[in-house]
UniProtKB/Swiss-Prot annotation:
Annotated keywords: ATP-binding, Ligase, Magnesium, Metal-binding, Nucleotide-binding, Tricarboxylic acid cycle
Name of the protein in question: Succinate--CoA ligase [ADP-forming] subunit beta
Family: Belongs to the succinate/malate CoA ligase beta subunit family.
Entry binding sites for Mg(2+): N191, D205
EC number(s) given by UniProt: 6.2.1.5
PROSITE patterns in the record: ATP_GRASP, SUCCINYL_COA_LIG_3
SUBUNIT field: Heterotetramer of two alpha and two beta subunits.
Source organism per UniProt: Mycolicibacterium gilvum (strain PYR-GCK)
Chain sites annotated for binding ATP: K45, G52, R53, G54, S94, E99
A UniProt-annotated Pfam family: ATP-grasp_2
Length: 387
């Protein structure tokens, strides 16, 4: 889960990472009130989960509360790379002597943690990596040893930070490591990490991605969910513990196992080329369980997608046999009743496939069409979606 900047800074404050005071708002009047309360020049910053805010006009300096009001009016509703600004962070402006970069992330290719640090902050880090690779330090972090003050200082030194700020930077870097580990993050990034004229180190921006797999032990992270921005179907699927991702297509997909579902997406997309260009409408993996309740929840999510014209259920029976899947489909259709109003193409294969097909045939539901193979099932689903 990606956080907004103001949410990242809430975590920073929790772990004593120094930053500038400010508050989030969704109105220009409130932005003016916050600026008045701060009593100093402020930055008015669009809260969107995408980079390039400054270039898009989403970050403005306000010398007075009236300036904050004007900038807030202009920024609210702004479209930044497809993200409409609904919230603003009004934070105290800071004098900047130098800008640095620091991040912690997962290095999946090397199966370790990685610290990245550079004296060249305030610009896109990809640009630094491309044009000044010697100015960007990439330091592997031992998961067991972690980051103590000495190692944090070493990271700062390798990033070419000036000697006079190494100690102060090390303290902040260690605290950012604490955010990374204690909050179960997969990314913690500060760009820029600034040095003020009086040699303070401040995190002026923050980007944090939290690992959703750790939600069970991070109760406090629920408050960070942006339900307004989350697709309602994805929210509904999450509430029912379904692995669902909405796509822009017409054929709903249900499968068991991520690999099979991904293959199904490809086959449906290929079949759709000869049926009006229809595409997969979603990724939905029901995993190893195909009970009536799980199947009903999955179908309920997909059938509530107005773009869906047909559904392709593609299941390979393993631990969960095909007869159990077939019974789940039949019972799910009974549970949904009139809500089940779009054709279902069902392809079963694997453990107890003959019995599964017999159950579906005897049920003789008017919406269910059986397919022998994945290719024929994808073709039929694409054909039905194009009618």
């Amino acid at each position: 889960m990606d956080l907004f900047e103001y949410q990242a800074k809430e975590l920073f404050a929790k772990h004593n990472v120094p930053t500038t005071p400010g508050r989030v708002t969704d109105s220009a009047e409130d932005a003016k009130a916050i600026a008045t309360e701060i009593g100093k020049p402020v930055m008015v910053k669009a809260q969107v989960k995408v980079g390039g805010r400054g270039k898009a006009g989403g970050v403005k300096y306000a010398a007075t509360p009236d300036d904050a009001f004007t900038h807030a009016q202009n920024i609210l509703g702004l479209d930044i790379k497809g993200h409409v600004v609904k919230k603003l962070l009004v934070a105290e402006a800071s004098d900047i002597a130098e800008e640095y970069y620091i991040s912690f992330l997962l290095d999946r290719s090397n199966r370790t943690y990685l610290a990245m640090c550079s004296v060249e902050g305030g610009m896109e880090i990809e640009e630094v990596a491309a044009t000044k690779p010697d100015r960007l330090a990439k330091v592997p972090v031992n998961a067991v040893k972690g980051v103590d003050l000495a190692f944090a200082r070493e990271i700062a030194e390798k990033g070419h930070l000036p000697a006079e700020v190494l100690d102060a930077a090390a303290v902040t870097i260690q605290k950012l490591w604490e955010v990374f580990t204690k909050e179960d993050a997969t990314l913690v990034e500060v760009n820029p990490l600034v040095r003020t004229p009086d040699d303070q180190i401040l995190a002026l921006d923050g980007k944090v991605t939290l690992d959703a797999n750790a939600d069970f032990r991070q109760e406090g992270h629920k408050e960070f969910e942006d339900k307004d921005a989350t697709d309602p179907l994805e929210l509904k699927a999450k509430e029912n513990d379904l692995n669902y991702v909405k796509l822009d297509g017409e054929v709903g997909i249900i499968g068991n196992g991520a690999g099979l579902v991904m293959s199904t997406l490809d086959v449906v997309a290929y079949a759709g080329e000869k049926h009006g260009g229809v595409k997969p409408a979603n990724f939905l993996d029901i995993g190893g369980g195909a009970s009536a309740e799980v199947m009903a929840n999955g179908l309920d999510v997909i059938l509530n997608d107005s773009q869906v014209k047909s559904v392709f259920v593609n299941v390979f029976g393993g631990i969960t046999s095909c007869d159990a899947v077939a019974n789940g489909i039949v019972k799910a259709l009974e549970i949904l009743g009139d809500e089940a109003n779009k054709p279902l193409v069902v392809r079963l294969d694997g453990n107890n496939v003959d019995e599964g097909r017999r159950i579906l045939a005897e049920a003789n539901h008017p919406l269910v069409v059986q397919a022998e193979t994945m290719d024929s099932g994808a073709d039929k689903a694409a054909e039905l979606a194009n009618k």
